[in-house]
Regions:
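Bacterial Sec-dependent N-terminal signal peptides
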Residues: 1-29
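Conserved, well-structured interaction surfaces
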Residues: 44-50, 54-58, 75-143, 159-172, ...
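Short, solvent-exposed turn/loop segments enriched in Gly/Ser/Thr/Pro and often Arg
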Residues: 60-77, 147, 195-197
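TPR/Sel1-like alpha-solenoid repeat signature
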Residues: 129, 202-205
Length: 206
């Protein structure tokens, strides 16, 4: 009887020990951001949205005039004489070329977890929706019909194999994103210098 009690106590102790170890192993890293720890404040949304500003093109140097009539190059441009060929792969349709759109949809799937001032939340949502529209405009300009995605896709998502949506469908969604941005973004004098504002969205929509 005494031996059975000892075995029972030992079993309980082991169970408790393994349970404690499991709790320790389930901790999130303290020196980096993790998804369950991130979506907690309006500032988190602003931080995420600010990451999209790198999509915008930088200042153009004098080389931007190479294909204009501003000056003549010493060597003829290859595209003038049709010396360039169309690639059989790549060219803006690879996995990485859709990364920004997925990042936008990743945000859209999570931002509602945050509680706070609705106008500030909508401001960050407006920035993200502007950049989703930005990405899709250039996809349509390059390829014509493209698949419209507004959900976060995984490696095994069936939507990865969907066909292209028509330009009309895609531009309907683009305009919805831009209209949301126009409605919820501030005027230039109401935000920090360099931040997205409603007039930039209006200009892009036009």
């Amino acid at each position: 009887m005494k031996k059975n009690k000892i075995l029972l106590i030992a079993a309980v102790a082991c169970t408790s020990m393994f349970s404690s170890c499991s709790d320790l192993l389930d901790l999130y890293p303290e020196d980096s951001l993790s998804d369950p720890k991130f979506w907690t404040s309006v500032q988190d949304l602003e931080l995420y949205a600010n990451g999209f500003y790198g999509i915008l093109p930088g200042a153009q140097g004098p080389g931007a005039d190479d294909e204009s009539d501003c000056y003549v190059n010493e060597k003829p441009k290859t595209w003038i004489f049709h010396l360039e060929t169309l690639p059989t792969s790549g060219g803006g349709w690879g996995n990485g070329d859709w990364g920004n759109i997925r990042s936008c949809n990743y945000f859209m799937a999570r931002y509602k977890q945050v509680k706070g001032d609705e106008s500030q939340i909508n401001r960050s949502v407006a920035v993200v929706r502007f950049f989703r529209a930005w990405e899709y405009v250039y996809k349509v300009k390059r390829f014509g019909d493209v698949p419209w995605y507004e959900t976060e896709l995984q490696m095994d998502s069936e939507e990865l194999y969907k066909g292209r949506d028509s330009r009309k469908v895609v531009f309907t969604h683009i305009l919805e994103d831009l209209d949301f941005a126009i409605e919820h973004l501030p005027k230039p004098n109401e935000t920090k210098t360099g931040n997205m504002h409603k007039y930039a969205s209006l200009a892009f929509k036009s």
